[in-house]
A protein has these predicted regions:
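Membrane-interfacial helix termini and adjacent extracytoplasmic/periplasmic loops
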Residues: 7-10, 49, 53, 58, ...
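Non-cytoplasmic
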Residues: 38-48, 149, 198-232, 247
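Transmembrane-helix boundary motif in ABC transporter permease subunits
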Residues: 3-13, 82-114, 131, 170, ...
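Transmembrane alpha-helices
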Residues: 22-35, 126, 150-151, 158-170, ...
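N-terminal signal-anchor/first transmembrane alpha helix
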Residues: 1-37
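Interhelical loop and adjacent transmembrane-helix boundary motif
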Residues: 4, 10-16, 61-69, 211-263, ...
Length: 276
């Protein structure tokens, strides 16, 4: 017979209900603290980084959009992000389907290899890609940069699309095949149309990963500039309040993209559940 009294359990329960939310709020505040500081500083009227800001101004946003070098870096980031995330979506979706529906040996090993760039330290991936592209003679051009970003973002696409394909009722695929559809017709007319929301979410995640990448970019980009690379160079050479405006824009973009991806995925999960 347990010696623990109901009164003790009740006290422990109340303590847990108080402690867990408190610790969670403290952790959330700690994680959000950089955002709480950076966002107000981006609207500062000061010539230097000061918190709290002495006055309100949009001068640093005007400085960003009025600087041709920043605009060029932004265009590069968008072009590289769109290209690499599209490549990652195609390769990642094909890989995810093979990993989920395949019946061959060694699937676990292949899955581990696909997600390796996500779990390895970025510096290791950067050095490996640097050596590989140098041997191919394409180091420092757009092809290498897009390929490197695709390598980094493909694991996220693989994981998201694997979840989506597992959630899709395989019996629907079997029915389509039994009614005379070829495997390609089943993929293009049955499976993929139902995975459009998940694919869009995976593409957004891949784009965010590419747009924020700096370590691998520093190794393989050569003279090409992206927003994160130029931010890093500015922080090393000269701290400019324009950085806070760019950081605020990136934070806002990332929050909107992730929220949109989560919303699209939730809607598709509901659709899959309804069909099942």
């Amino acid at each position: 017979m347990s010696s623990t009294s109901p009164i003790t359990l009740s006290k422990d329960g109340r303590l847990a209900r108080i402690t867990l939310p408190t610790v969670s709020l403290m952790a959330l505040f700690f994680l959000a603290l950089p955002i709480i500081i950076v966002v107000p500083m981006s609207f500062s009227s000061s010539e230097s980084l000061r918190f709290p800001p002495p006055g309100f101004s949009l001068r640093w946003y005007q400085s960003f959009f009025g600087d041709s070098q920043w605009v060029e870096a932004g265009i590069n980031s968008i072009v590289i992000g769109v290209s690499s995330s599209t490549i990652a979506l195609v390769l990642g979706t094909l890989a995810a389907y093979g990993l989920v529906r395949g019946t061959y040996r060694g699937r676990g090993f292949l899955e581990s290899n696909f997600i390796a760039p996500m779990v390895l330290p970025p510096i290791i991936v950067a050095v490996a890609l640097y050596i590989f592209f140098a041997r191919l003679g394409i180091l420092g051009n757009y092809v290498a940069l897009i390929a490197a970003h695709a390598v980094l973002s493909t694991p996220y696409v693989v994981l998201l699309m694997m979840l989506a394909i597992r959630a899709f009722d395989e019996r629907i695929e079997q029915v389509a095949l039994s009614l005379g559809a070829t495997h390609l017709q089943m993929l293009t007319r049955v499976l993929l149309p139902n995975l459009v929301p998940n694919a869009a979410a995976a593409w957004l995640f891949a784009f965010v990963i590419s747009f924020d990448e700096v370590v691998v970019t520093m190794f393989v980009s050569g003279t090409h500039m992206t927003i994160p690379k130029r931010m890093f160079n500015q922080l090393v050479l000269q701290i400019n309040p324009t950085i806070t405006a760019i950081a605020t824009l990136l934070i806002g973009f990332s929050i909107v993209a992730v929220a949109l991806a989560a919303w699209m995925t939730r809607g598709s999960n509901g659709l899959s559940a309804a069909k099942a």
